[in-house]
Amino acid sequence: MFTGFNIKYPEYEVITPQTNLSYHVRSLNVQEEERLKASFLTPTKANDHLNKCIFDSFVVKPESIATYDAWLKKTTLKDRDALLYGLYHITYEDIRNYDVTCGQCEKSYAVTVKASETFSMKSYENGDIINKEFDTELPISKTVFATIKQPTLWDEVMALKNQRGTKELDIFTETLIIKKLFQTPETGGDSVVYSEREDIIDAYRSLASKDKRHIYKEYREKFGQYGINLNMLSNCHHCGHEELISIDLVGNFFRMVYSI
């Protein structure tokens, strides 16, 4: 009977860009890869397994993160990107056969790069980002305000659990940055507030397109710009056109899990 090897897996330290916490992650083993393969059936299941895979990879974590739920509540989506990068880097390192479509001639070609050569990070240095929120008035829907925040993994888990179907997934994810929408009457009186997720989605769908773009511009300026980027300069193999390519970390992570 197999009783286990005495193996010390490679480790990598990650400082999360938005909550500024230090974690040491270890590389995946084959069993964990197999679990991830089995999870890729529904978005909710894949998301849950990915979160647990990252959490289980921690060799060292902050004292304030005692449980899995505590980690979900104290980790932003942008922080998870950084932790996933650390897990990817220590497990696979190379980004192999990444398909790029040229913006000039529109032909596809494959490239291989080291993940570390594409990495850059901008940290949030203005205190506790998780409990911060701000109101912004919408430019077209006058007197309507959106309260914007940086969503956590817990927010995402709750939204996925309550979604109305796979077709709703994109809009559930899209509206995680909105804590509530409310309208203040011009004549005074109480505001009409929509803070339940389904009400937020219905209200969001009624907004003008310019209002939607305004919400995301404000989110990016206050929160979204803080995180990691995986960018590389690439030259088209067909026409020689050079352009900056942004790498899809989650998609590439699952692609590597499925490769031999």
Language-model segments: what does each one mean?
Residues M1-I260:
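Short, surface-exposed, charged amphipathic helix/loop patches that serve as local interaction elements
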